[in-house]
Amino acid sequence: MFSPRSIRHCRACGAPTAYREPPDDNRERAICSACGTIHYENPINVVGTVPVFEGKVLLCLRNIEPRRGFWTLPAGFMELNETTEQGAVRETVEEAGAKIVLGPLLTLLNVPHVGQVHLYYRAEMTSAALDPGPETIEARLFDESEIPWDELAFKTVKVTLERFFADRRRGQFAVHCADIA
C-alpha cells in the first residue's frame, strides 16, 4: 500500500507535523503540532489520450524518468484549476504537439500502489503533424500490428491500448474501469 508520509511541516504555519489519527477519522493524517491543521494526502490524477489519425495510434517515446526510452500514450499529471479533459488535451500538445478533438473517456484505472488514478480519453487527431516537446524523444503513429507491446512504459498504457483495440474491433466503445496492481 502506498503511504508517502511526506508532509513534515504545516503548509499553513510551517510548524512540524506528526502523523496520528484525528478524532472522528479512521486513518492517520499529518497534523500540525502548532495550529492543528490536518493535512490530507490524496491520489494524484494522471490524464491522457489515445490519439488516432487515419486508424493509427499516436505513441511517444519518453525522454524522462521513470521509464525513459519506453513508449507511452501522451499523458501526465493533472494541474490545479483544470478539468481532466483540459489536462488530457494539454498533455497531448505538450508531449506530442498533436492537435486533437477530444472524445469520450475510455479508461479509468486505479493504481493504488503508487497513489494514482489514470484517466485516458479517446481523441481524433486533426492532422498527422507532430511537434514533440522536451519530454518526448520521438512521437509516431502506429498501426495495431506495429505497437511495441514489450516496450511500453507502463501497465496502464498497455491496458488502455488493449481495451481500445478490442473495442474498435467490436465496433463499440465503452468506459473501462480496472485496478492495476
Where are the predicted features?
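Acidic, metal-coordinating catalytic segment for phosphate/diphosphate chemistry
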Residues: 2-48
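Conserved Nudix-box catalytic region and its N-terminal flanking loop in Nudix hydrolases
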Residues: 52-94
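Conserved hydrophobic "DFG−1" position in protein kinase catalytic cores
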Residues: 51-52, 59, 123, 141
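Unchanged
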Residues: 78-101, 105-163, 167, 171-174, ...
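A generic structural signal for short beta-strands and their flanking turns/coil linkers
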Residues: 28, 45-47, 67-69, 98-101, ...
